[in-house]
Amino acid sequence: MAFKFENTGERPRTVHHLCEVQETSLLELQLQCVYCKKELSSSEVYNFACKDLRLVYREDSPYAVCNFCLLFYSKVRKIRHYNYSLYGASLVALTKKELFDLLIRCYRCQQPLTPEEKQLHCEYKKRFHRISRTWTGLCLQCWRHTTSTETAV
């Protein structure tokens, strides 16, 4: 069943909140990709929820993003909207916040980085990147799948 949310103030922003409003489970939730319009599989809906990504609305209907489009448009975003890079200590000095208090997402898959992943960036002297007004780095899963030159942006 397709829900419409005409009142912008009442629109659920997360998949979990949408499940509550629609009184359905995460596995039964049906969402389309905002880019390719394909229906997301149950595992893609679950991944979207685990990455704590936000729903977007088109014509008052909620949309998410499929795994293929997420990786593709993350790459496009990295290329088009890269600003600059900083090491962990410089990022702490600039923001006046500890790394653990900053929301830093993986620039490849958009997963929020764990405190351990942020610490690894510091230990291995990998930089964090400012891409489209957001701090990014690499999660462990994507770290394994990328080459060392790719982290230099």
Curated annotation (Swiss-Prot):
Gene3D superfamilies: E6 early regulatory protein. GO terms for biological process: DNA-templated transcription; regulation of DNA-templated transcription; symbiont-mediated perturbation of host apoptosis; symbiont-mediated perturbation of host ubiquitin-like protein modification; symbiont-mediated suppression of host cytoplasmic pattern recognition receptor signaling pathway via inhibition of IRF3 activity; symbiont-mediated suppression of host type I interferon-mediated signaling pathway. Pfam families: E6. Disulfide bonds: none annotated. A motif (PDZ-binding domain) lies at residues 151-153. A zinc finger (unnamed) spans 33-69, 106-142. It is found in: Host cytoplasm; Host nucleus. GO terms for cellular component: host cell cytoplasm; host cell nucleus. Keywords: Activator, DNA-binding, Early protein, Host cytoplasm, Host nucleus, Host-virus interaction, Inhibition of host innate immune response by virus, Inhibition of host IRF3 by virus, Inhibition of host RLR pathway by virus, Metal-binding, Modulation of host cell apoptosis by virus, Oncogene, Transcription, Transcription regulation, Viral immunoevasion, Zinc, Zinc-finger. It comes from the Viruses. Transmembrane segments: none annotated. InterPro entries: E6, E6_sf. One of its GO terms (molecular function) is DNA binding. Forms homodimers. Interacts with ubiquitin-protein ligase UBE3A/E6-AP and thus forms a complex with human TP53. Interacts with human NFX1 and MAGI3. Interacts with human IRF3; this interaction inhibits the establishment of antiviral state. Interacts with human TYK2; this interaction inhibits JAK-STAT activation by interferon alpha. Interacts with host DLG1; this interaction leads to the proteasomal degradation of DLG1. Belongs to the papillomaviridae E6 protein family. Plays a major role in the induction and maintenance of cellular transformation. Acts mainly as an oncoprotein by stimulating the destruction of many host cell key regulatory proteins. E6 associates with host UBE3A/E6-AP ubiquitin-protein ligase, and inactivates tumor suppressors TP53 and TP73 by targeting them to the 26S proteasome for degradation. In turn, DNA damage and chromosomal instabilities increase and lead to cell proliferation and cancer development. Belongs to the high risk human alphapapillomavirus family. The cancer-causing human papillomavirus E6 protein has a unique carboxy terminal PDZ domain containing substrate. This is Protein E6. It comes from Human papillomavirus 30.
